[in-house]
Amino acid sequence: MDLSRTRLPASLGRIVAPLLLAVAASGALAQQDADRFPAAAMSFLGGELPAMEAAIAARDRDYFENAMGRMLDFSDSWGFKTRDNPALARFPMCTDAVSDFLVVGMCRIMTTNAACEPGMSARFNSNLQQCRALAAKL
């Protein structure tokens, strides 16, 4: 009766199983191809900007709270808010457009807010146009 042989696979399984789960999880969190980011940013903004315009017209501040969650989810999926994806540094116009669109929209409702800088809307529009042009090229 050789008990060491029957125990080895079980103990090995207890060691290997968590490692395999960690590898699988890291694969699920693998970064997306950075070259696709401008198109993804424009797709995200293409859905959000019309909804934001409707919210501004209706003075619906609830939109902004929900949109903030969607923006954070998008940012997290690409790793640019946490600096997990340094490859996105080549696309500051796109990361800034995604980061700033809600502030620009809120400033159209709450014009006296301290975060509402005079040039913010112009910078956002410039970043949006540059990101759109880049997305069309890539």
Role assignments for model-derived ranges:
Residues 12-20:
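Sec-dependent signal peptide hydrophobic core
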Residues 24-27:
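N-terminal signal peptide c-region/cleavage motif recognized by signal peptidases
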Residues 32-90, 120-137:
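Alpha-helical segments in soluble extracytoplasmic regions
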Residues 100, 113, 122, 137-138:
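Secreted/processed peptides and extracellular or luminal domains of membrane proteins
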